[in-house]
Amino acid sequence: MEDIQKNHEAQRGLQNRHIQLIAIAGTIGTGLFLGAGKTIQMTGPSVIFAYILIGIAMFFFLRTIGEMLYNDPSQHSFLNFVTKYSGIRTGYFTQWSYWLVIVFVCISELTAIGTYIQFWLPHLPLWLIEIVMLALLFGLNTLNSRFFGETEFWFAMIKVAAILGMIVTAIILVASNFHYTTVLSGKTVNDTASLNNIFDGFQLFPHGAWNFVGALQMVMFAFTSMEFIGMTAAETVNPKKSLPKAINQIPVRILLFYVGALLAIMAIFNWHYIPADKSPFVIVFQLIGIKWAAALINFVVLTSAASALNSSLFSATRNMYSLAKQHDKGRLTAFTKLSKAGIPINALYMATALSLLAPVLTLIPQIKNAFNFAASCTTNLFLVVYFITLYTYWQYRKSDDYNPNGFLTPKPTIAVPFIAIIFAIVFASLFFNADTFYPALGAIVWTLIFGLYSHFKKI
């Protein structure tokens, strides 16, 4: 009987060390390596407060997910709880919306991977690179989830090594009172690595409070993959041990990897001169004589994008599997099929096939603008899903399943409203920026139209 059950459930192949590194990989995105200069220019040293504020909100948000998963780790996704506690129609809307978001992430990350590889192989067709990389990651995802965990483990280690290298470099330069002459933002700068670069003339909002809110947007969307750890519970060997540990270490990781890296950059360079359009990591490593710094950081962001695509394929596959088991059972039964390795194989085929839209976009650039707009709209759906998840958590607390002795969210009556307010501020601010207004409006239109469809659909 046990063997039969195993053949009908995704297999538990993820070890504790995999979960810890998956949590790190979900915390660190390409935005830190490529976009740190832009966020620093928007609000100066107070950018660290933006990361801390959003980091606190995301930590408590993950604690709400962790509390539900700890109580019932058999669920294949944290989204399953939406159906369980907020109703089947809300669950239908949320899971389909989240699946759509993840598919768009797959396409976007595959395109990014191709661009990064062309840094070294500029004459190789982008569409060919995309197909080869997708085939490789598809192959990895057909193996036992333990292999997925190993891949993410080493992807995360590369990112961690780059950040720690930056922090150690800053400590050495500051401690040695390192003086340098370099060109930043078109200006010749003579300066010394010092903490004074951060604290002298400090202003909380040097470019106004609105730019600080704009930085909150960028930080929020840099953190949107952190909930991925909630997709791994059903395939973790000992979720009641590993999940709490991984989630509780998130604040330390944010302080070390984000705040630590940003402080390191701003200690070396006066923030006024840090260019918004160039990676500060490249500038720092070039400063200490690493001539191939650009290639090094390109390798890091390549592994980061590959990690994001790998995780997104994993997530889209499990989400479709969960959808097929909970909703539309007649039409989606094929997606409940598991391979011998315990992988929802047909769901993986579907996610991979849709990811092939990336090389199609490369070959037919005329439709790329429409895709970019749709991708921007779906990115904002992350926040819609987060709001629904918060509501679901509150419904769980009122249900008979509530476990007062579990992995409890600290001060939930304070934490949940705080999270909701931060998320609401970020979402509302999207309507006051020309670049984000229409994508935010598109997310609302999707929510209204598909929400009504989900409400009236026979399920």
From Swiss-Prot:
One of its GO terms (biological process) is amino acid transport. InterPro entries: AA-permease/SLC12A_dom. This is Serine permease SerP1. The lineage of its organism: Bacteria, Bacillati, Bacillota, Bacilli, Lactobacillales. Gene3D superfamilies: Amino acid/polyamine transporter I (1.20.1740.10). One of its GO terms (cellular component) is plasma membrane. Keywords: Amino-acid transport, Cell membrane, Membrane, Transmembrane, Transmembrane helix, Transport. The chain crosses the membrane at residues 19-39, 42-62, 97-117, 119-139, 153-173, 212-232, 254-274, 281-301, 341-361, 370-390, 412-432, 436-456. It is a multi-pass membrane protein. It comes from Lactococcus lactis subsp. cremoris (strain MG1363). Disruption phenotype: Deletion mutant shows a significant growth defect in medium that contains only free amino acids as a source of amino acids. Mutant shows a strong decrease in L-serine uptake and cannot transport L-threonine. Can still transport L-alanine. SerP1/serP2 double mutant is completely devoid of uptake activity of either L-serine, L-threonine or L-alanine. It is found in: Cell membrane. The keyword Transmembrane applies. Its main location: membrane. Belongs to the amino acid-polyamine-organocation (APC) superfamily. Amino acid transporter (AAT) (TC 2.A.3.1) family.
